[in-house]
């Protein structure tokens, strides 16, 4: 039975930066207030680019770093909650076309919010272990600025745009060790984009009530996220007879520094183990984890064989954890 390995990672962010000081001119807030409560200092915002553009640029680099030819990629899966188009075509189809991948390639989207990248890993791993595919391109891409209400200070300060991509390939070394995913839709309305689907179709009333934007009950989500993320990590470590010290890098979803710190401290991860990018990117939903992996890869921390523990929680609710050995070449060797 073949095993699957993450053999390359890459990310892309748009050029424009929106700082906390910019928000001081837009809503009733301050840099001090935002940093203290979220850890976010800035975020990147796409002006002319759309989600598939962001995903294409990250994916192009991921393929290049993998050492594969584009013709060897046999599936493209994109996780996003801000697709180019509400219904169709999928963002993955557009990215595959933009990249000039094989005609007829398997391409589809998933929606798992901030847990999207871990769901992508599980799908890619399953396709490869089953023998159905050999090289799967996975992408978390978001233009969250298109679904953010910039008059709502409780949400607009949190989110940014960006994309992260990885190539998952059949390999006998540095394999994906384990992945756990889960969901609970009973509290879906605590983190939701209510409008423009079949529940509240696009209309003057939908737009008037700002139902086309992200709505979040922040305090409730915070409490559930900390408990759920901690439990998810404990379960996957226990299932694999591992301890926190067996992990080289803990890479949580970059939503809020208070959530990250609470989970890190509960699980006894050190500052050196924890990868943080929330200050410069904000919450980029499904792109958050691959962007964080890429940052630690490009600065030389993550190397071939590094053991990574990924952990995420998002709307749905969805959550999940993954343990894997990084299978790509060292950045210094590219």
From Swiss-Prot:
Gene3D superfamilies: 3.40.47.10. One of its GO terms (cellular component) is cytoplasm. Transmembrane segments: none annotated. InterPro entries: ACP_syn_III_C, ACP_syn_III_N, FabH, Thiolase-like. It is an enzyme of class 2 (transferase). Residues 254-258 are annotated as: ACP-binding. Pathway: Lipid metabolism; fatty acid biosynthesis. The keyword DNA repair does not apply. Its main location: cytoplasm. It catalyses: malonyl-[ACP] + acetyl-CoA + H(+) = 3-oxobutanoyl-[ACP] + CO2 + CoA. Its EC number is 2.3.1.180. The keyword Chloroplast does not apply. GO terms for biological process: fatty acid biosynthetic process; secondary metabolite biosynthetic process. CDD domains: KAS_III. Keywords: Acyltransferase, Cytoplasm, Fatty acid biosynthesis, Fatty acid metabolism, Lipid biosynthesis, Lipid metabolism, Multifunctional enzyme, Transferase. The last Arg residue of the ACP-binding site is essential for the weak association between ACP/AcpP and FabH. Belongs to the thiolase-like superfamily. FabH family. Homodimer. NCBIfam families: fabH, PRK09352.1. Catalyzes the condensation reaction of fatty acid synthesis by the addition to an acyl acceptor of two carbons from malonyl-ACP. Catalyzes the first condensation reaction which initiates fatty acid synthesis and may therefore play a role in governing the total rate of fatty acid production. Possesses both acetoacetyl-ACP synthase and acetyl transacylase activities. Its substrate specificity determines the biosynthesis of branched-chain and/or straight-chain of fatty acids. This is Beta-ketoacyl-[acyl-carrier-protein] synthase III. It comes from Campylobacter concisus (strain 13826).
């Amino acid at each position: 039975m073949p095993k699957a390995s993450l053999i390359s990672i890459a990310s892309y962010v748009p050029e424009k930066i929106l700082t906390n000081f910019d928000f001081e001119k837009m809503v009733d807030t301050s840099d001090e207030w935002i940093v203290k409560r979220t850890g976010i200092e800035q975020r990147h915002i796409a002006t002319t680019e759309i989600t598939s553009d962001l995903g294409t640029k990250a994916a192009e680099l991921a393929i290049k770093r993998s050492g594969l030819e584009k013709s060897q990629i046999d599936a493209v899966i994109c996780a996003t909650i801000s697709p180019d188009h509400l219904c169709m075509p999928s963002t993955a189809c557009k990215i595959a076309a933009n990249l000039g991948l094989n005609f007829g390639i398997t391409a589809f989207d998933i929606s798992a919010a901030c847990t999207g990248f871990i769901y992508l890993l599980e799908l890619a791993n399953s396709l490869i272990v089953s023998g159905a595919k050999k090289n799967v391109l996975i992408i978390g891409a978001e233009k969250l600025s298109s679904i953010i209400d910039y008059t709502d200070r409780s949400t607009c300060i949190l989110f940014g745009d960006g994309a992260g991509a990885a190539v998952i390939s059949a390999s006998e070394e540095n394999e994906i060790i384990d992945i756990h995913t889960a969901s609970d839709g009973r509290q879906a309305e605590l983190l939701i984009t209510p409008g423009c689907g079949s529940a509240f179709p696009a209309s003057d009333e939908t737009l008037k009530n700002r139902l086309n934007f992200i709505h979040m009950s922040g305090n409730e989500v915070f409490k559930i996220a900390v408990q759920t993320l901690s439990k998810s990590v404990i379960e996957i470590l226990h299932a694999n007879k591992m301890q926190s010290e067996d992990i080289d890098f803990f890479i949580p979803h970059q939503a809020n520094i208070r959530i990250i710190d609470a989970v890190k401290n509960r699980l006894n991860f050190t500052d050196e183990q924890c990868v943080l990018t929330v200050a410069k990117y904000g919450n980029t939903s499904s792109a958050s984890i691959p962007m964080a992996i890429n940052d630690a890869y490009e600065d030389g921390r993550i190397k071939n064989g590094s053991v990574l523990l990924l952990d995420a929680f998002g709307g749905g609710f969805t959550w999940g954890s993954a343990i894997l050995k990084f299978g790509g070449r060292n950045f210094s060797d590219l």
